[in-house]
């Protein structure tokens, strides 16, 4: 599954079950991405809110295309749309 993008960032909270599932899904697909812990980095937390309009995680940023507060099925659908 190849999506050619400049920047893929996943904003997570370490205790978030959906975040762990998103990490697992991206890792299984062999996606290179930056994992950002918004609890450890207040600036990243503020950026996540600015990008998504909410404070819920996970938030995926693929070259400015944002998927927020999602589960594995929504992630798979989002990824398919990116491949087109």
What residues fall within each predicted segment?
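Local sequence-structure signature of Cys/Sec-based thiol-disulfide redox active-site neighborhoods
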Residues: 1-29
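Thiol-based oxidoreductase modules, predominantly thioredoxin-like and allied folds used
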Residues: 32-45, 55
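Short alpha-helical
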Residues: 17, 43, 74
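Non-catalytic, surface beta->alpha helical segment in thiol-disulfide oxidoreductase systems
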Residues: 62-84
């Amino acid at each position: 599954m190849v999506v050619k993008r400049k920047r893929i960032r996943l904003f997570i909270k370490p205790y978030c079950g959906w975040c762990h599932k998103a990490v697992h899904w991206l890792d299984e697909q062999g996606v290179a991405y930056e994992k950002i812990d918004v609890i450890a980095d207040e600036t990243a937390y503020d950026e996540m809110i600015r990008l998504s309009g909410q404070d819920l995680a996970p938030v995926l940023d693929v070259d400015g295309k944002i998927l927020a507060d999602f589960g594995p099925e929504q992630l798979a659908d989002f990824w398919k749309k990116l491949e087109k």
